[in-house]
């Protein structure tokens, strides 16, 4: 397995600059298993939104498609749990991607309830409580 950072994900998803995008595509679309950090996914979502103006719904669709690839593993998370939370995020106002990743990590580690001051975290179907 080879780890992939945010810069590779962004180049793969936006297709520019062309030379780097082709290299990123060769890696992501290739046979080698790749590992994605949840932090890289969150950072990728942020870069796509702030630097490229991509809508959150489109970002979620791209991340869901990426995570569903046969050769992709999200480090420290179960794919089914992450996909479930990302799919749920599609239905939520604002589609908060970092919140979805926090919930997925807590679910994967069975670290529940989730301590938070953000009352909206419960919309992912997890038990929350204030600290």
Model-identified regions with their sequence ranges:
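Acidic, PIN/NYN-like endoribonuclease modules and their adjacent C-terminal/linker elements
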Residues: 1, 103-131
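Short, well-structured N-terminal submotif of metal-dependent ribonuclease cores
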Residues: 1-36, 52-61, 119, 131
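Short, conserved active-site loops that position catalytic residues or coordinate cofactors/metal ions
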Residues: 38-46
């Amino acid at each position: 397995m080879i780890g992939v950072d945010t810069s590779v994900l962004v180049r793969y998803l936006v297709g520019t600059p062309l030379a780097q995008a082709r290299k990123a595509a060769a890696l992501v679309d290739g046979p080698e298993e790749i590992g994605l950090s949840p932090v890289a996914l969150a950072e990728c979502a942020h870069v796509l939104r702030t630097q490229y103006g991509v809508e959150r719904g489109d970002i979620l669709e791209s991340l869901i498609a990426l995570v569903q690839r046969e050769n992709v593993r999200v480090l420290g998370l179960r794919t089914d749990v992450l996909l479930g939370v990302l799919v749920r995020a599609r239905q939520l106002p604002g589609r908060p991607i970092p919140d979805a990743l926090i919930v997925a990590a807590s679910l994967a580690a069975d670290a529940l309830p989730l301590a938070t001051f953000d009352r909206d975290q419960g919309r992912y179907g997890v038990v929350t409580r204030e600290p």
